[in-house]
């Protein structure tokens, strides 16, 4: 596996994990936009800022709070609590049995002609964890599962000495959870918090993905916008088109429920 890991940014073009995961077209065109001339809708920043505040609170709970007392309340044995170390030095070997917890660690890794950078939010032992404040739909539909897995795989690529487990875990904190839905639908999250585990790509698979992505960016960066690769439906989180039939046109105007739904327009017309 090629690439070197650095504690501080070495000379070179920085490219973040989150940026690299964006569609190629979006990534290229964003660089051509003068953001100082753009009008920002503050309301669109609410979810992002809530996510930042959540991560900040979790970090401070471990670095500034009485986490030992919190673990005792959760009935962790003192023998486990005594083995926890918060952000121990990465350049020194740990004593046998010690359980490291790393929070908000930024790393840099040289790969081909770029410097890949990412911030590791939470790691316990050798397992990567992340926390997401999101909708219940994101959890039940699995619409972002592949994105979570890819992000975790890229972080492992940057921090191979820390992230050794092949499985990562996402802790979900739902912003729209409703207890009445949990009672009536067993597929709905049964509590305001839940988790999922994802198998990470191998380091070789991740390196192949990186090489392919960078090649795609280089190729399209030379093209005029009209010839650049289009964003796929998957990248746009767009589902297949559906066609609805309403027996009463007034129901359609009011946004009511359709009489029948079709996958193809021709089927709807024939009906």
Predicted segments, located by residue:
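Metal-dependent nuclease catalytic cores that hydrolyze phosphodiester bonds in DNA/RNA
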Residues: 1-127, 139-146, 178-187
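Amphipathic alpha-helical segments that form well-ordered structural scaffolds
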Residues: 53-61, 154, 158, 209
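Metal-dependent nuclease catalytic regions and adjoining charged, substrate-binding loops involved
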Residues: 112, 158-271
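Acidic active-site catalytic centers that drive phospho-/nucleotidyl reactions
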Residues: 121, 130, 151
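Activation of the activation-loop gatekeeper triad in protein kinase-fold domains
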Residues: 131-135
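An active-site-proximal "capping" alpha-helix that borders the catalytic cofactor pocket
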Residues: 146-163
């Amino acid at each position: 596996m090629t690439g070197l890991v650095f504690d501080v940014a070495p000379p070179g073009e920085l490219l973040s994990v989150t940026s690299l995961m964006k569609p190629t077209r979006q990534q290229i065109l964003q660089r051509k936009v003068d953001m100082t001339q753009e009008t920002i809708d503050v309301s669109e920043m609410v979810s992002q800022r809530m996510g930042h505040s959540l991560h900040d609170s979790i970090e401070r709970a471990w670095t500034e709070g009485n986490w030992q007392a919190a673990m005792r309340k959760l009935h962790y044995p003192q023998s486990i609590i005594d083995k926890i170390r918060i952000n121990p030095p990465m350049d020194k070997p740990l004593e046998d049995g010690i359980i490291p917890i790393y929070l908000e660690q930024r790393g840099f890794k040289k790969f081909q002609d770029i410097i890949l950078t990412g911030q590791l939010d939470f790691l316990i032992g050798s397992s990567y964890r992340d926390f997401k404040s999101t909708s219940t739909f994101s959890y039940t539909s699995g619409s972002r599962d592949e994105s979570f897995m890819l992000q975790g795989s890229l972080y492992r690529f940057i921090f191979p000495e820390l992230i050794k487990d092949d499985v990562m875990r996402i802790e979900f904190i739902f912003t729209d959870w409703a207890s009445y839905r949990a009672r009536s639908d067993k597929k709905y999250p049964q509590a305001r918090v839940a988790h999922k585990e994802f198998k990470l790509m191998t380091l070789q698979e991740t390196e192949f993905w990186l090489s392919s992505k960078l090649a795609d960016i280089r190729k399209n960066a030379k093209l005029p916008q009209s010839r650049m690769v289009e964003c796929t439906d998957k990248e746009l989180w767009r589902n297949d088109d559906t066609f609805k039939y309403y027996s009463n046109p007034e129901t359609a105007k009011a946004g009511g429920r359709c009489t029948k739904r079709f996958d193809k327009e021709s089927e709807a017309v024939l009906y």
